[in-house]
A protein has these predicted regions:
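Structural motif
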Residues: 27, 54, 89-92, 212-216, ...
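Conserved catalytic-core segment of NTP-binding enzymes
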Residues: 96-102, 109-112, 123-234, 252
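Canonical P-loop GTPase G-domain recognition
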Residues: 229-252, 256
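Loop/turn-to-beta-strand initiation segments
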Residues: 82-85, 114-118, 146
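N-terminal phosphate/diphosphate-binding loop that engages ATP/GTP or pyrophosphate donors
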Residues: 39-91, 96
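General beta-strand structural signal in soluble alpha/beta enzymes
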Residues: 25, 49-53, 87-89, 118-122, ...
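Walker A (P-loop) phosphate-binding motif
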Residues: 5-43
C-alpha cells in the first residue's frame, strides 16, 4: 500500500509514456469526475488534453472550450491547440447531453500530431453507482493504452438490485446475486475478473486500472487479501482507492 504523493506514479499506471496517450474510462460511480481530474493532472504536467466520449456525456461546467464536429480527425490545427478542450459530435437537447464519436473516429484522431492526451468516457451508467456491461458495451477505442474501471464504494455493505445497479440482469448473471442481497467486496472482485465484467472489450496489451471511488465510505469493509486478488492474478495492473472529490483524490495505490 502506498500513499500517492508524486503524480508520476499514476502516469506509470496509465501507460502515459505513449504518445498520444489514450485513456478510456468505464464503469459507474464517478467516470466524468475522474476524467476532469485526469485532465487537470495531465495539464499540470504540461500535456495538452482532449476530452470526448463514445457514448453520451453531460456538458461540463467549465471554462474549457467545447467543440462540436462530424469528424474530429479533420479538425483544423487551431481547434486542437487548447491546453484542455472537449470535443463531441452533436448536442442532444432531449437528453441534455452531448453525443460523442464511434471508437474508430477516436482511433483516427490519434494520427494527428497535435493530439497529446485523449480522455474518453467509454461507457454509460445512467448516473448509478455500479453497473455491468451490456452486450454492446463498453465502446472502447482500440488505440487506448489504458482502461480505468470505476466502481463506487458507496454500495458496499448495502442491499442492491435494479434500483441502484445499472444493467442489473447482466450484473446478477456475472455475480450470481439476487435482488436485496448485501454487496460484498468479493462481488466487485468477481465483476473485475469476469470476462464479461468490468474490463470487457479491453484491447490487447492495454493497461487496466481498477478504481474504487468514494473509498472513505467503505474503508472498514475492505479486506486487503480479497482486494488484491485481481492484482495477484494479473487481471489488472493497478488498483486505486480514493475519492475523486477529495484531496488526495487517490489515497491508496496497489501495484505488483
Amino acid at each position: 500500500m502506498k500513499s500517492i504523493i508524486d503524480p508520476a506514479a499514476l502516469f506509470i499506471d496509465l501507460g502515459a509514456q505513449k504518445r498520444p496517450t489514450v485513456i478510456s474510462v468505464v464503469g459507474a460511480g464517478g467516470k466524468t469526475s475522474l476524467l476532469f481530474w485526469l485532465a487537470q493532472l495531465f495539464q499540470s504536467g504540461g500535456r495538452r488534453v482532449l476530452i470526448t466520449t463514445t457514448t453520451h456525456m453531460f456538458l461540463p461546467e467549465s471554462t474549457w472550450p467545447v467543440i462540436f464536429c462530424r469528424d474530429p480527425a479533420m479538425l483544423p490545427r487551431t481547434s486542437l491547440s487548447s491546453p484542455v478542450s472537449f470535443c463531441f459530435h452533436h448536442w442532444k437537447a432531449t437528453q441534455g447531453k452531448a453525443k460523442g464519436f464511434a471508437p474508430e473516429a477516436i482511433d483516427a484522431l490519434t494520427q494527428r500530431p497535435e493530439c497529446d492526451v485523449i480522455l474518453v468516457e467509454a461507457d454509460g451508467s445512467r448516473g448509478m453507482p455500479l453497473k455491468a456491461p451490456d452486450e454492446h458495451e463498453p465502446c472502447i477505442p482500440q488505440s487506448s493504452c489504458c482502461v480505468i474501471a470505476v466502481m463506487s464504494g458507496l454500495l458496499l455493505g448495502e442491499k442492491i438490485g435494479a434500483e441502484n445497479v445499472h444493467r442489473w440482469p447482466q450484473f446478477a448473471d456475472i455475480t450470481g446475486l439476487t435482488p436485496g442481497t448485501t454487496l460484498q467486496l468479493s462481488d466487485l472482485v468477481t465483476l473485475v475478473r469476469h470476462p464479461l465484467g468490468a474490463f470487457k472489450n479491453v484491447p490487447q496489451d492495454c493497461r487496466r486500472v481498477w478504481f474504487i471511488n468514494r473509498f472513505s465510505h467503505c474503508e472498514n469493509t475492505i479486506a486487503q487479501s480479497e482486494l488484491l486478488k485481481p492484482l495477484q492474478q494479473h487481471d489488472v495492473e493497478a488498483i486505486w482507492l480514493g475519492d475523486i472529490q477529495e484531496f488526495p483524490a487517490i489515497a491508496r495505490r496497489f501495484v505488483n
